[in-house]
Each structure stands twice: as C-alpha cells, then as structure tokens.
Amino acid sequence: MIENKVLPFIKNNQIKCFYTLASFLMIYELCINKIIIDYVKYTEIDWSTYVQQVEVFLKGIYDYTKIEGDTGPCVYPAGHLYVFSLLYNLTENGLNILKAQYIFAAIYILLTFIVFSIYGESIKESIKQITNKSNNNNNNNNNNNNNNNNVFLKIPFYIIIFLCLSKRIHSIFALRMFNDCISMLLFYISLYLIIKGRWNLGCLFFSCSVSVKMNVLLYSPALLFLLLSTFGIWRTIPKLMICGLVQVLLAIPFLMVNPQGYLLRAFEFSRQFLYKWTVNWRFLPEHLFLNKSWALFLLSIHLLFIILFFIKYIKKEQGGISNILKRGSINQNPKLLSVNYILLIMFTINLIGVTFSRSLHYQFYLWYFHTLPFLLWSTNYNLFLKIGFMCITEYAWNTYPSTSTSSLMLFISNFILLIQLYFQPTINSLREDKNNSSGLKKKKTK
C-alpha cells in the first residue's frame, strides 16, 4: 500500500524530491567534512610547497624560473599564485593548517552546491522532455518526420547521491588541499553559466580556471565546438578573446620580467611524470611509461577520439559543419543548445583526455569524478552496471600505491564507457522551447 502511494508521488514530484534530497545531502556534507577534519589526520603533500612559492612571489620576484618550493618549481599559471596568496594571508602565512582545512571544506561545499545546480538543470530538462513526449503521444500529433531526432536523456533526481560517496574526493579537499580544488570550482561555475546562456561570463570563469591549473584545457575542444555550434565562427572570436585576455592580464607582472620563462614554466606540456605516482598506467613497464613515443601515441589517440566524437555530433547538426561555420557570417541568431547536450559534449571530451592522459595522480580524480554519474546515465547500462562501474572506479582511485590490477581496471572501465558513449544515439542539440526556432526571442544568449 505504501509503495503504491510513494512511487507515484516521487514520479510526479521529481523536482521537489530533487531539492529535498539535495538539501539533506548538503547537510550531510557539512557534517562529514567536519568529522573528517576533526578525526582524520591531515596529510602534508603540496600545501607547504604552495606556501613557499607564494612567499617568493610576495617578495616581489616575478621571474617564474625563480619561483619554487621544496618539491620543485611553480608549474602552474599565474592564477595559482594569486589564489594561494589570498589563502596564505587568510591562514596566518600558511601556518594555520586547521583554518586552511576549513576553507577547503567550504570550497568543497560550494563546489558541491554548484554541481548540484548543474545536475538540477539537467534533471529539469529531462523531466520537461519526457512530459512533452507524453503530451505529444496523447495528442496524437503527426511528428513522424522528427521521431528519429527525438532522442533525449532520462536523468533521475537520485543521481546526486553518487556525487557524495567518494572517500578520495573528500580527502583531496579537507586533508590534501590541492590547487585542483580551486580550478575545478571555477570550472563548474563556468559550466553553470554556460548552460544558463551566459557565455561571456562562462568563458571568463573558464579562463580563470585554466589560470589556476591547465587540466581544464581538456574541456577546451568541447567548449570551442559548442561556441561554434551556438554562435558560428565570427561570433565565437570575441568569446575566445575573453579567454585569451584573462590569461594575458593575470600574467602581465611575469611577462614583463621574463616572458619566455613564464610561458615555459606555466604552460609546460613536455613535463615528465614520475612512474611511482601514476594511477592509470601502473600495468605498463616503467621504460615504456617514460618513453616519448608512448606520450606521442597517447596524444594521437586522444586527438583521434576527439575527431570521431565531433564527427558523430556534427552529423546531428542540420547542414553539418558548413552550417556551424556560416552561422555568424549570415546574421543568424544564436542557437539555444540543450543543457544535456552541452553537458554530454563537455563531459565526454574531458573523459577522452582523462582516459588517454600521460599520467593520472590521485588528486586528478577530481578532474572528472562529478561527471561520471551523468555520463553513466547517458548510456543504456542497467542500474547495477552503473553502480558497479562507480565502485570499480572508486576502488582504483583508493588503491595506494596503485597496482597493475587497479590501474588496468581503471583504464578498461574508462575506455569501455567511452566506447559505450560513442555508440549511443546522439541526443537533441536544441532545447525544446517554443522560441528556439530563431535562437532566442525572450532571453538573449550572451
């Protein structure tokens, strides 16, 4: 009897259920972060190095080749130094570790809130599409010509539970305090702005995120594709200029002193990773892991998969690539892309980069953890397979030190998910709004 009443209520009130569940989970996160800080020992890894780098910077030394700490030189762009200079001042010159932990716990809570907001937009769109389809079927509309294009995702409200269950992710914030926490917070703010149609602000925050750590560049091919799909080539250029201008403005003090040193240090793509820290390639022999040919092979496969997925997405576009490139030049209004289409492309292209990364360290789990539930629910896996996938992934990232088995499990699971995503039908690219025939009439896309 209870089941007969509860299930229909949940089905008909998914948005209310989402907000209720999200509220409880936020309270849970506040409590769990407090417990972690109070009862789990802090682990020093990079915080002291960040502090030492900031101290050199605050002394007025702007030559990037001279900014370093115990574990090495500063290999992050200028935004990293600005952010950690602020944290340095907030934590009594970096000495108040407990205060720093609480700040990073607050950053975790804020990031979780933003991610919940992104998933909320996704869930609302899914419910709207399901309702519209049901209404169309009931009204017997003759939409046979559009049936092939009527593909959308069914994202359930309870998916956000899986965003709060990772031991590793909690430790990255409250116990490790890596700069990845800052860069991913800025990225998710950027992504939320983008799905709300605030592209200029989205590009600004995206570039700020890159200025803290370059891993966010893994999303850049997807961002470029979405910009072209929305605005066309000419109207995309100002958005790219925003991204570039942010990097230049933040780097001015360092570019004026030693521009070559800054560019080589802050954007060093040839940096060699240590085999002992790799999470994803432990099953390879060390000599192969360190081989430059292996790095070039991974880069080639990375680019190949990006091209294959873009071809898949372009086929969904009416008029193909030529229509995308023409849009800005023939004065067409911007298109309003669907939330789930934006998220699927951004998250999938990032997963490609993660899967074929030269090396993943433990904190790099944060690069894609919050995207996994969405990607898994974008496939036709059953619930048990989806949960099993997340358990395998969590196991691999919590195995320390990594083993041949754990790293092989991680690579295979990521690779299988990529293949599954490739063979899924491409979802609708446009939002199902009455005003979307000419872009947007009521709400401007900026």
Curated annotation (Swiss-Prot):
InterPro entries with a match to the protein in the record: Glycosyltransferase_ALG3
Q: What is this protein called?
A: Probable Dol-P-Man:Man(5)GlcNAc(2)-PP-Dol alpha-1,3-mannosyltransferase
The protein's gene is named alg3
Similarity comment text for this entry: Belongs to the glycosyltransferase ALG3 family.
Where does this protein come from, organism-wise? Dictyostelium discoideum
Reaction equations catalysed: an alpha-D-Man-(1->2)-alpha-D-Man-(1->2)-alpha-D-Man-(1->3)-[alpha-D-Man-(1->6)]-beta-D-Man-(1->4)-beta-D-GlcNAc-(1->4)-alpha-D-GlcNAc-diphospho-di-trans,poly-cis-dolichol + a di-trans,poly-cis-dolichyl beta-D-mannosyl phosphate = an alpha-D-Man-(1->2)-alpha-D-Man-(1->2)-alpha-D-Man-(1->3)-[alpha-D-Man-(1->3)-alpha-D-Man-(1->6)]-beta-D-Man-(1->4)-beta-D-GlcNAc-(1->4)-alpha-D-GlcNAc-diphospho-di-trans,poly-cis-dolichol + a di-trans,poly-cis-dolichyl phosphate + H(+)
Role: Dol-P-Man:Man(5)GlcNAc(2)-PP-Dol alpha-1,3-mannosyltransferase that operates in the biosynthetic pathway of dolichol-linked oligosaccharides, the glycan precursors employed in protein asparagine (N)-glycosylation. The assembly of dolichol-linked oligosaccharides begins on the cytosolic side of the endoplasmic reticulum membrane and finishes in its lumen. The sequential addition of sugars to dolichol pyrophosphate produces dolichol-linked oligosaccharides containing fourteen sugars, including two GlcNAcs, nine mannoses and three glucoses.
- Recall the taxonomic lineage recorded for the source organism: Eukaryota, Amoebozoa, Evosea, Eumycetozoa, Dictyostelia
Keywords annotated in UniProt:
Endoplasmic reticulum, Glycosyltransferase, Membrane, Transferase, Transmembrane, Transmembrane helix
Question: How does the entry describe its membrane topology?
Answer: Multi-pass membrane protein
Report the pathway entry.
Answer: Protein modification; protein glycosylation
Q: Where in the cell is it found?
A: Endoplasmic reticulum membrane
- Domain of life, source organism: Eukaryota
What GO molecular function annotation could you give as one example from this UniProt entry?
Answer: dol-P-Man:Man(5)GlcNAc(2)-PP-Dol alpha-1,3-mannosyltransferase activity
Query: Which EC number(s) are documented for this chain?
Result: 2.4.1.258
Q: Where are the transmembrane segments?
A: 17-37, 103-123, 155-175, 177-197, 214-234, 237-257, 294-314, 336-356, 372-392, 407-427
Sorted alphabetically, the Gene Ontology BP terms of this entry are: protein glycosylation
CC per GO annotation: endoplasmic reticulum; endoplasmic reticulum membrane
